[in-house]
A protein has these predicted regions:
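Phosphate-binding P-loop
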Residues: 1-6
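Short hydrophobic/aromatic beta-strand immediately N-terminal to the Walker A/P-loop
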Residues: 8-12
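Conserved glycine(s) of the Walker
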Residues: 13-18
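A conserved segment at the C-terminal end of the G1
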Residues: 20-32
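Switch I (effector-binding) loop of TRAFAC-class P-loop GTPase G-domains
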Residues: 29-45
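Conserved nucleotide-sensing/catalytic segment adjacent to the nucleotide-binding pocket
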Residues: 43-92
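Conserved phosphate-donor/acceptor-positioning beta-strand/loop module used by diverse small-molecule
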Residues: 89, 104-125
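NTP-dependent small-molecule kinase module
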Residues: 146-182
Length: 182
């Protein structure tokens, strides 16, 4: 199902909340080609793209350079823009990015992925090769909580099935659901 207007789905949440896991579930079974221009992205065909690279640890917009916002905002304003734009993480979760998307006609939905403090702690501790600076982590947590508070929808990061059901009710979820393969 191809949308009649451009759609954007962007997942935000604290490090370890389950954004990458949820995005992987939303795009499960969808074949893609990795592309580098205008920024690294996964091309699922039919003008459906996910910003960033595919990898098991820290995928998505975490793989983009800090200056990625300039080419991404130019892309969403162009005639070659994706019809469905997916993203997750805080790299591009800025007013500049969301405003550019909305100004270009995107129906943008920001979804907060939320879990309790104990779950976040357990998930972070399970990442034995990830030991972030505490000041950096506090900054990310603060930014993520603010983004979730302003999100259009908040889904549980500890109940993947329920989170997917809530997103599948959205116009962008309808498109992705039609493309997903079990």
């Amino acid at each position: 199902m191809s949308p009649t207007r451009p759609l954007m789905l962007y997942l935000v949440g604290q490090p370890g909340a389950g954004k990458s896991t949820l995005m992987a579930a939303l795009t499960a079974g969808m074949p893609f080609v990795e592309r580098k221009h205008p920024v690294a992205h996964l091309d699922y065909g039919d003008r459906v793209v996910q910003l960033g690279r595919h990898r098991s640890e820290f995928p998505g917009t975490d793989t983009l350079g800090m200056a990625a916002i300039t080419p991404v905002t130019g892309w969403v304003r162009s005639n070659e823009r994706p019809m469905v734009l997916l993203g997750e993480g805080d790299r591009l979760a800025t007013p500049k990015f969301f405003d550019a998307g909305r100004a270009a006609g995107y129906e943008a939905t920001v979804v907060g992925v939320a879990v309790d403090t104990m779950t976040i702690g357990a998930r972070r501790n399970a990442r034995t090769d990830w030991h972030p600076n505490e000041a950096w982590l506090r900054g990310r947590d603060t930014k993520s909580r603010k983004l979730c508070a302003a999100a259009d929808l908040v889904v549980p990061g500890d109940d993947l099935e329920r989170a997917m059901q809530e997103i599948d009710r959205l116009p962008v979820g309808d498109v992705l659901g039609g493309m997903r393969r079990p």
